[in-house]
């Protein structure tokens, strides 16, 4: 970013007036510099604002219901900041003034909130003050429903902080005292501080260094979050009156530090201590979190009376041995989710795991998480108690170092929908290996990898092309050590519908026999492997296969001289989605793909340019895909796209992606060969202009993306004939303007026009500004992301931040023209007159010059700005006080019409000028220079510089302008003062000690300042300075 030049104040005034007038007329976006979003939300995030913006009176401020000011630099909130937003309900002020520990540069910051800031908004329901350096709870309106004070500097909550907040239901105050926001103490919640909040249902006090449960909490609470404090004992009285509690989180209070991902305090020996009756009275409890609590065993009494418990989190404890023999699960018949992850023994990986029989009593269990327990073998005895659970749908076993797995055991689970065995060491049905897969958190629902996910242009109908696995039986074996696949692995898994095998090392040639048992398989992910596609009957054993991901299997395609057979595609009758992306396919593949069912093909990341360069060999490569709707040809190194290439694409195409190629030219008229095309993506290419013709008439194109090219010119009327175009992306190009003639009547139907990140030329009166204002409902990010590229001082700024100094003023232009014409005439006349009558002019000039000094001198005397320039040492407070309260008052205020004009540094010096410029102007613009001295033995700084300038004036103008005022007799001992008193007594004045002599002093000082010093010199010694006549 270049240096910023501050505009002239007058320019800012004119600019502000012009913007205010424009806003009053309703032309500019109503909430500049912020952005108005649907449902009355105003977004002011990341604008580096230093104060709350004051929106124009012409803006529909009454319609604003939500204001977001996240990540600005607002350090002071005033009483009047939100008064004009009469219907504001949601206010977000996160990350404006973060505490030192949370600041990126660790700078301390404290936010100031005036008393009536929020009281002035009686409709406010949700307020977020998180990540701000506030030390106390501000005054809040009674309408507040949700309040967030997390990651602030509030360390004390007292009874008066929430007075009158009877409607408050949600209170968040997390992270006010922890390792990232240190405070060296515990947050203090006074007993009964929250008791007055009769409707409070959700209270979160995580990461606050608490050592006990706050006393006398509101009985209305149904959610209490106290995790990651230091509460190591729990007794019934801690939760005595919380009978309505539904969710309780007390995890992380006595941590297991060998698995901690952040600074951790070791749990004391024999802790935590939980009283047997701690939870017995919480009959409505549905969720209990005891994770990361250093538990070695579970007491049956802890769960007595918890008949409604549905979610139990016991992860990150030491319960490995206990889960093989516990009996506590027999009575938890309503439990739906159980988390036992990372209950491993330190530095131990067990050969087998056998769950306790009591797991069979979890008849309502739907999800069981057991990743990170570290056992090497998964057999039919491992999960036997779970096989009869009628509702179990999800089972997570990832990251367990399993190298032997009998996958057939999952066929015995009647309702199982998802099994996650990713990040293990499975290499086959019964052959262990020693390698360890990468650690991954796992996923609950299978999703396509990022490389396969359809982009924005495919989002409309993506559901038609990519079947979802959310409600189907899914097995995830990704990130294991599989090298080959045998059909024995999938015995009894005929119900399986989704299989994920990505990120393995499968390098075998699939021949149609590997997946024989999986007769119902619909989705197969084999990405990031090394598959050899040599056989023509690959995957033909899967008659119901709808989606096949073969992306990132590039190694076989990079082998020189090895052929690849893609004819299997024609033999998959149900295949709808196929990905061959990022395989580097360039030669020795089937000459043509054929399929009557395929609707979406991802062929990105290959080398189609090399294939089409081989004459007509691969010209019809895609033509056999008769019902193809979506085709992705991104990153195929295409430099040209000839009409015959488009002509041999399927006529059924609706979406075509050509992103990130090297296309510098596109024949727009050739779009007629794709009559069904609705979306075309040409982003990230090298197009310089949209100039060769226009979009053809009759095209069904609805979306066109040409962003991230180098387009600097568009032919007028280019988009006119595409009357169905709804979305147009021209962002990140080289456009200097946006011309309404490009679109014609299309502007009436265009829903999205993205022109952000273009170097627009913000000249005054630019036509594109008016056009974009007319289209502002269709232009995303108009007020923030549509910026200027020129002139230089506006680069990167909003198009509405124009500097009006750049505007063309016709009157000023005529004046400048007249002045330049006069200068030209003078430039011609002066040499001519010098040539014709130079001697006469020279004589007249010098004759006039002889009279100028006296007149100039007299004129200068009359036009001096000040009678005296007062110089004194500001560091001496007594002297400064005398000058301001005695000298100034006597000479300027009490002399009536004879008042003198004094020049004082603090008052009369011009800001912006250098010290020497102000000093020189003060000495030469004053009749006298008066030095007010308290001592004369050490004179330096401003006094010395002023004295030297006065002496310089004596030498240049032969004027003695020095007047000395001595406040103490001790200063009278100076040799210079004594000499000057003998030569020019009236210019040296002593402040009298007796009040009776002060009247005479002021009279003598007035005479010394109004008369020339020449009249004061002692004629016995000298005549004083004289001026040449």
Curated annotation (Swiss-Prot):
Residues binding DNA, per UniProt: 46-50, 71-76, 94-108, 131, 151, 178-180, 207, 261
Gene Ontology biological process terms from the UniProt entry: canonical NF-kappaB signal transduction; defense response to virus; inflammatory response; innate immune response; positive regulation of B cell activation; positive regulation of B cell proliferation; positive regulation of immunoglobulin production; positive regulation of interferon-alpha production
TIR domain residues: 864-1009
Disulfide bonds: 34-44, 97-109, 177-183, 254-267, 257-264, 469-498, 762-788, 764-807
Gene Ontology CC terms: early phagosome; endolysosome; endoplasmic reticulum; endoplasmic reticulum membrane; endosome; lysosome; plasma membrane
Lipid sites, type S-palmitoyl cysteine: 257, 264
GO MF, one example: pattern recognition receptor activity
Record keywords: Cytoplasmic vesicle, Disulfide bond, Endoplasmic reticulum, Endosome, Glycoprotein, Immunity, Inflammatory response, Innate immunity, Leucine-rich repeat, Lipoprotein, Lysosome, Membrane, Palmitate, Receptor, Repeat, Signal, Transmembrane, Transmembrane helix
Chain positions carrying an annotated carbohydrate: 63, 128, 199, 209, 241, 331, 339, 380, 472, 511, 565, 667, 692, 729
PTM comment: Activated by proteolytic cleavage of the flexible loop between repeats LRR14 and LRR15 within the ectodomain. Cleavage requires UNC93B1. Proteolytically processed by first removing the majority of the ectodomain by either asparagine endopeptidase (AEP) or a cathepsin followed by a trimming event that is solely cathepsin mediated and required for optimal receptor signaling. Palmitoylated by ZDHHC3 in the Golgi regulates TLR9 trafficking from the Golgi to endosomes. Depalmitoylation by PPT1 controls the release of TLR9 from UNC93B1 in endosomes.
InterPro entries membership: Leu-rich_rpt, Leu-rich_rpt_typical-subtyp, LRR_12, LRR_dom_sf, TIR_dom, Toll_tir_struct_dom_sf
Domain of life: Eukaryota
Membrane-spanning ranges: 816-836
Stretches in topological domain Cytoplasmic: 837-1029
Subcellular location: Endoplasmic reticulum membrane; Endosome; Lysosome; Cytoplasmic vesicle, Phagosome
Signal peptide (UniProt feature, chain positions): 1-24
Membrane topology, from the record: Single-pass type I membrane protein
Quaternary structure and partners: Monomer and homodimer. Exists as a monomer in the absence of unmethylated cytidine-phosphate-guanosine (CpG) ligand. Proteolytic processing of an insertion loop (Z-loop) is required for homodimerization upon binding to the unmethylated CpG ligand leading to its activation. Interacts with MYD88 via their respective TIR domains. Interacts with BTK. Interacts (via transmembrane domain) with UNC93B1. Interacts with CD300LH; the interaction may promote full activation of TLR9-triggered innate responses.
Homology family: Belongs to the Toll-like receptor family.
Function (record text): Key component of innate and adaptive immunity. TLRs (Toll-like receptors) control host immune response against pathogens through recognition of molecular patterns specific to microorganisms. TLR9 is a nucleotide-sensing TLR which is activated by unmethylated cytidine-phosphate-guanosine (CpG) dinucleotides. Acts via MYD88 and TRAF6, leading to NF-kappa-B activation, cytokine secretion and the inflammatory response. Upon CpG stimulation, induces B-cell proliferation, activation, survival and antibody production.
Name of this chain's protein: Toll-like receptor 9
Source species: Ovis aries
